[in-house]
């Protein structure tokens, strides 16, 4: 039996953009949304769902997509820059060590309330 009140979405690149789009349009349907290096869809400035993004070191998001430091505090959002991890390292092109680092960050966010 699925706990439909605790759904979590996660996506990489365009999948991350779609995750943020879903969080914008249907915030009541998910508890958390995780993006890995999306670039175009603005992260909604909201307390629900909880939002988290891991950022590669080689591409910047478009202007206004990521929250400011003040917005991160206000809305309990997290933006984590991964030094030495590129956009394509976040998928099958990454090393085991890079994937372990990504998984550690994601697991930590998933256990936060």
What name fits each language-model region?
Residues 1-8:
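Gly/Ser-rich "nucleophile elbow"/oxyanion-hole loop immediately N-terminal to the catalytic nucleophile
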Residues 11-15, 19:
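Gly/Ala-rich beta-loop-alpha elbow adjacent to hydrolase catalytic centers
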Residues 21-31:
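Conserved hydrolase catalytic core segment
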Residues 25, 72-74, 112:
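Alpha-helix C-cap/termination motif
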Residues 32-92:
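The feature captures the conserved acid-bearing segment of alpha/beta-hydrolase catalytic domains
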Residues 94-113:
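Catalytic active-site module of serine/aspartate enzymes centered on a nucleophile-bearing elbow/loop
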């Amino acid at each position: 039996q699925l706990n439909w009140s605790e759904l979590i979405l996660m996506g990489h690149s365009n999948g991350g953009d779609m995750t943020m789009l879903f969080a914008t349009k249907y915030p009541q349907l998910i508890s958390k949304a995780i993006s890995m290096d999306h670039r175009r869809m603005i992260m909604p400035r909201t307390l629900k769902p909880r939002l988290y993004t891991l950022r590669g070191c080689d591409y910047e998001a478009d202007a206004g997509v990521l929250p400011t430091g003040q917005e991160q505090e206000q809305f309990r959002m997290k933006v984590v820059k991964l030094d030495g991890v590129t956009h394509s390292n976040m998928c099958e092109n990454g090393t085991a060590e890079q994937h372990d680092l990504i998984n550690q960050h994601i697991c930590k966010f998933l256990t936060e309330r």
